[in-house]
Amino acid sequence: MRRFFVFVVFCGLCVVIGAVPAKPIVKDSVLADGSVVQMVLRGDEFYHYYEQITDCGLRITDYRQQIVERRERAIAKRRMSDTQAERPYMLGRAPHQAERGLAILVEFSDNSFTKVRQNFDDLLNKDGYDYNGATGSAMNYFKDASNGRYVPQFDVFGPYKLDREMSYYGQNDREGLDMHPDQMVVDAVAKLAADSLAGVDFADYDTDNDGNIDNVFIYYAGYGENEGAPEDAVWPHAWEVYDEYVMGQLSYSGKRIKSYACTSELQGSVGSTMCGIGTFCHEFSHVLGLPDFYVTDYGSSHKTLGDWDIMDAGAYLNDGNTPPTYSAHERFYLGWLTPEILKDSGDYVLEELQKSNKAYIITEIGEHNLDGGKPNPNTYFLLENRQKTGWDAYLPGHGMMISKTIYDEDKWYNNVPNNDKNSQGYDIIEADGKAPNGSYGKAGDLFPGTSKITSYVLYAKYLIADIEEVDGVISFSFEEEQEVSVDNEECVFGLISRLNDSELLGVSVGTIVYCYDGVGRLLWRKECVGNSLTFDTPNGLYVLRIIDGENVRVIKGI
């Protein structure tokens, strides 16, 4: 079995900053003894390292706690220095329908563009953009994800030659952070402001008229460190410009530079293939208010959404040319989808998300305020239909996606929603129950999926059953089960728990019993051949669903 041996090459901090995760490309590396090993880059702009793929179980344990401690100190420092009344992530913001975005192309004194401005204008704005197998432009992506509610226009300027070398901006400090990427933004805006032919009016990019340019997006010449380029290259990310860390003018005609994001001109670390829209859309999604859904402090290596989501590794699907569409959760959060509350028993149908913009929401109490930015209850499940078409063509699989959200504003603000393995803020329920570390997604994650899982129990009382997919359409049944207490004298069932097994009493020949674990996954299905059923006792809480003719009952056991 292949495992990962961690080499801590360089590390850094991630506070509320957003960044695209490393592209998981495996490459050969020569060690000091001359041996060749396979390495894969992990992490993002704010903490990254190489892992060696080996056949042994070696691991390093000391560095993870150090990372967590550094990160916690950085968050405290960030909060102390933040004098803005508004948090940098505009939580739950619903963007304007025709918002304008500012994009600037910059070259370094020692590095020039191989592509021209029209290439980037097409990448961002051209309807039906298909260069290098692309599914569409950035404009197409956001238009489709918002169901036509958000159709941004990206104004592209440059390229401008900066006075400093690439290493000035991208060189890593001792903690692995790029030295001066924010200065690159200040220098780029200065070049644009000095270009009389451009005739830019920065007021066009202050949609909410708060005195700040809504966002400055930088495309820099060459490659990104996230795809294996040298450490002197800039790693794509999104953040803000602070006076104390930069030199030069920050305000023009009463409009100040504040939020920015950036990414590279080219894919990979060699060649001349132009970038796709994946990294741009990932970083611009931070501008809209979405956090990262991968593990941002690298104090853990548990599975997150991976290829299923653009705010995780999905930004790299089809080499960044076909990032997956926004999930129902992201659309709900941004105000682009209002899910239907599922509480009445019956049969239901789900059309594909990209076609229908439809999802169901399930809460423990059967009610919800339907405000994705400030959800109440803050814990809920969403059901959506994902098919391998359009923006989702490169997903690991297809079927019904069941996701769970535990919304915590502080975790979203600090960009740490999924860092706690035992309480992830947003994740999918793997239908096959398998969530191996290092997995970026698999066909068995959705329902019925390759494992043919057709039922699931939520909150130990809501049953989703008979899940079927026909021609890309999902059908299922939903019902709230009537719970039976085994202590009730009127109960016709009894449950005896012994050391190694348990026995269900009061059943009859032909009674069907389903057993689910504490999180709702089906463990087994048995048909009774007598008046009792003996089974191995599951670990922890479990739920028995008993179907005896037309009668359906539920028993909880421990």
Which ranges hold each PLM region?
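Glycine-centered tight-turn motifs at strand-turn-strand junctions
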Residues: 70-73, 498, 522-538, 549-551
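Short, glycine-anchored, charge-dense loop/turn motifs used at functional sites
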Residues: 515-523, 542
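Residue-level detector of functionally pivotal "anchor" positions at catalytic/ligand-binding pockets or at interdomain
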Residues: 478-503
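Active-site-proximal segments of metallohydrolase catalytic domains
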Residues: 88-92, 137-253
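Active-site recognition of the HExxH zinc-binding catalytic motif
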Residues: 218, 278-293, 383
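Non-catalytic C-terminal accessory/binding modules of secreted extracellular proteins
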Residues: 31, 114-115, 122, 129-149, ...
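A domain-level signal for the mature, folded cores of soluble proteins
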Residues: 166-179, 183, 187, 268-275, ...
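C-terminal tail/sorting-segment detector
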Residues: 484-487, 539-558
